[in-house]
Amino acid sequence: MDTVLIHVLNSLLYASVMFLIAGGLSLIYGVMRIVNLAHGNLYAFGAYVTAWAVGAALGGAPQASLWLYALLPAGAVAAGALGAVLEPTLLRPLYRRAEEYQLLITFGLLLILEDLMRLIWGPYPLSISALYEALGSLAIGESIYPTYNLVVIVVGAAAAAGLWAFVYRTQFGVVLRATSQNMRMAAALGVNVNRVYVEAFSIGCFMAGLGGAIVVPQQGAVLGMGVDALILAFVVVVIGGLGSLEGALVGAVLVGAVRELGITFFPEIELAVLYLMAALVLLIRPAGLFGRV
């Protein structure tokens, strides 16, 4: 029973991080109809900023103080602020162009962000494992489980609930959904579409940055992590449906569960099983489980 609970917690841990990335990706597409290929590197950017901020505050001390955990959202804030700059400067001029232009500019942005992170922080990984170790472990029956992993699960669940409440229970959420349904009609009714777009893009980037920020104490920040995360985020949104927050949540939970089963029983083909699951969903429901045709 202890082993089963550990596997469930590991599934939820991975699902929490994947939802933060895929949820932001789906939000951006749902409102703006842009597939942001640079989204994974915004996740990596959040990880690097948090690792740098906490590392600078830690100052080489062997143990972390509790107040350092308040610096974890720094990467999310930085990613959101970067999104607020990128949307009006790089993306807005392309809304009336063909989708190929949007893919090219976001792919170029992916490469720029990768080189920018290499330039600022160098080619070597950044680690703040002291925050991961400082919380210790909890006893679950005869097993132990890292306490920080539970923090990640709680943050992921809180982010999912907060995003749902923001989109479906606030006035701006109504405007956001109206713009996603019909941008021209929303503009005709007096909605500032440009403001909606920049805020939606910033929120999506904030979520990606938050994913990187909460995972960096456990995994560290390393070049290339954004591309790996982007690929798996696309698996999530393919399963759940691109543009659907509910689909991103369900897809993240499914991917987390299948990945944990794969690591446990057939680690050699773990990723192949995820891609096969995504392919089967595409065959049965091309728009995903919750996607709109």
Model region roles, listed by residue range:
Residues 31-85:
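Membrane-embedded helix boundary and interhelical linker motif in transport proteins
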Residues 144-222, 245-250:
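Helix-loop-helix "hairpin" substructures at the membrane interface of multi-pass membrane proteins
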Residues 1-21, 35, 49, 60-70, ...:
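Membrane-interfacial amphipathic/re-entrant helices at transmembrane-helix boundaries
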Residues 94, 99-169, 196, 261, ...:
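Transmembrane helix-bundle core of multi-pass membrane transporters
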Residues 61-109, 116, 250-255, 285-286:
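Alpha-helical transmembrane segments within multi-pass membrane transporters and channels
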Residues 20, 68-76, 198-208, 212-278, ...:
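Transmembrane alpha-helical segments in multi-pass inner-membrane proteins
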